C-alpha cells in the first residue's frame, strides 16, 4: 500500500492541492507515502510535545495505514521542503508554523466530510478556524484544554501501587470506562457510533501493553492509556480513578508510579485536561506534571 488508505477515504479527500501564496510563491499539499517516513518524523521531532500523536501513529503503523484513521499530508514550499504536516481524518491534527500552510490544510479539511474533531495549540487552531469557518463550517462543541508535561517524578508518601498492563480479561471494564469518559467529554457514545471498531481499538491497545491498571478484587481502581509513544514523548489519555476511591491519594500514587515506569523509555510524558476540571490540575501537579500550554479541541457536526 503506497498511495491511499481506503477507497472510501480517497473518494472524498484529494491526493494533491496546489495554490499560490500571497507572496506569489507556490505551495503544494500532497498525500504522504511510506517512503516519506524519515523526513516526516524528522520534521515532527522538532516539537515533540505537540506532535507526539502524529509521530506515534507513524511509528506504530507507518505513514499509510487504515489504522491511522485518516491520511497524512505534507505541505511543501517551492524549494520542496516541508512547511507543514497534517493528519486529515477522524481526528485532524496539524503541525506547521506557516500560516499559508494552515490555510491550505483548511481547504483540504473542507473536502473531508467525516472528521470528528480538530485539535491543536490554541493560537494555531484559532487561525486555522478563521480560514475553515469562511468555508461555511460551524463547531458542534469547542473545548479549551491545558497541556501538562512530566519530566521527573516527586517522592510521594504511601504504598506503591502494583500497576500492571491490562489483560483481555479487563477489556469490558476498560471499554466501559473509556466510553463513559468520551461521552462526558464530547457527547458522542463510541459504542453507538462505532461499537465494533471501538472495541477492536481498545483490545488492540491492550495487546500492545499500552493500558495500565491497578485492580483489587477484579475491579479496576486506576486506569491510564498510552495513546502514543516516541523516544522523546509519551502521550497519556483516559486517566481514571474509580469513583468510590477518589480522594484517597490512590490516583496520585498510581500516576506517579506510572511516570517512573514510562520515563525509563521516553524523555517526557504529556497529557491534556479540560480547563473546566480545575481540581484535575492540582492532581496532575502533585504527580509531577507542569503546565506547558493551551490547546483547543473543536468537535464537528457529523455529515
Model-derived regions: residue spans:
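Acyl-donor-binding surface of acyltransferase catalytic domains
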Residues: 2-18, 77-83, 87-161, 298
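Hydrophobic adenine-recognition pocket in adenosine-nucleotide-binding enzymes
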Residues: 239-241, 273
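Conserved beta-strand-loop-alpha-helix junction that forms the acyl-donor binding cleft
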Residues: 119-125, 271-282, 297-303
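Flexible, substrate/cofactor-facing loop regions flanked by secondary structure
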Residues: 158-233
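Conserved donor-binding loop and adjoining core beta-sheet/short helix segment
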Residues: 21-35, 42-117, 221-237
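Conserved acetyl-CoA-binding loop-helix of GNAT-fold acetyltransferases
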Residues: 99-108, 241, 247-263, 282, ...
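Conserved GNAT acetyl-CoA-binding A-motif
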Residues: 113-122, 233, 262-273
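Short amphipathic alpha-helix that is part of the acyltransferase structural core
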Residues: 4-54, 153-191
Amino acid at each position: 500500500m503506497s498511495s491511499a488508505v481506503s477507497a472510501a477515504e480517497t473518494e472524498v479527500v484529494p491526493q494533491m492541492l496546489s495554490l499560490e501564496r500571497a507572496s506569489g510563491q507556490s505551495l503544494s499539499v500532497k498525500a504522504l507515502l511510506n517512503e516519506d517516513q524519515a523526513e516526516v518524523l524528522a520534521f515532527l521531532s522538532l516539537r515533540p510535545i505537540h506532535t507526539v500523536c502524529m509521530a506515534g501513529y507513524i511509528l506504530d503503523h507507518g505513514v499509510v495505514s487504515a489504522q491511522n484513521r485518516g491520511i497524512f499530508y505534507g505541505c511543501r514550499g517551492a524549494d520542496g521542503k516541508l512547511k507543514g504536516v497534517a493528519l486529515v481524518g477522524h481526528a485532524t491534527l496539524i503541525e506547521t508554523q506557516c500560516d499559508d500552510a494552515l490555510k491550505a490544510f483548511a481547504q483540504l479539511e473542507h473536502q473531508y466530510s467525516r472528521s470528528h474533531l480538530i485539535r491543536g495549540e490554541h493560537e494555531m487552531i484559532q487561525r486555522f478556524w478563521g480560514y475553515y469557518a469562511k468555508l461555511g463550517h460551524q463547531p458542534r462543541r469547542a473545548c479549551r484544554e491545558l497541556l501538562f508535561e512530566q519530566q521527573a517524578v516527586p517522592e510521594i508518601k504511601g504504598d506503591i501501587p502494583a500497576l500492571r498492563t491490562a489483560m483481555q480479561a479487563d477489556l469490558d471494564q476498560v471499554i466501559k470506562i473509556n466510553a463513559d469518559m468520551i461521552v462526558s467529554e464530547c457527547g458522542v457514545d463510541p459504542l453507538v457510533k462505532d461499537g465494533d471498531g471501538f472495541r477492536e481499538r481498545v483490545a488492540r491497545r491492550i495487546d500492545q501493553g499500552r493500558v495500565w491498571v491497578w485492580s483489587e478484587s477484579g475491579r479496576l481502581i486506576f486506569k491510564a492509556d498510552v495513546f502514543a509513544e516516541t523516544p522523546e514523548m509519551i502521550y497519556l489519555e483516559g486517566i481514571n480513578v474509580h469513583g468510590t476511591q477518589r480522594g484517597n491519594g490512590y490516583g496520585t500514587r498510581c500516576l506517579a508510579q506510572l511516570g517512573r515506569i514510562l520515563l525509563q523509555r521516553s524523555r517526557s510524558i504529556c497529557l491534556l485536561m479540560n480547563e473546566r476540571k480545575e481540581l484535575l490540575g492540582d492532581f496532575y501537579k502533585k504527580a509531577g506534571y507542569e503546565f506547558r500550554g493551551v490547546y483547543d479541541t473543536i468537535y464537528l457536526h457529523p455529515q
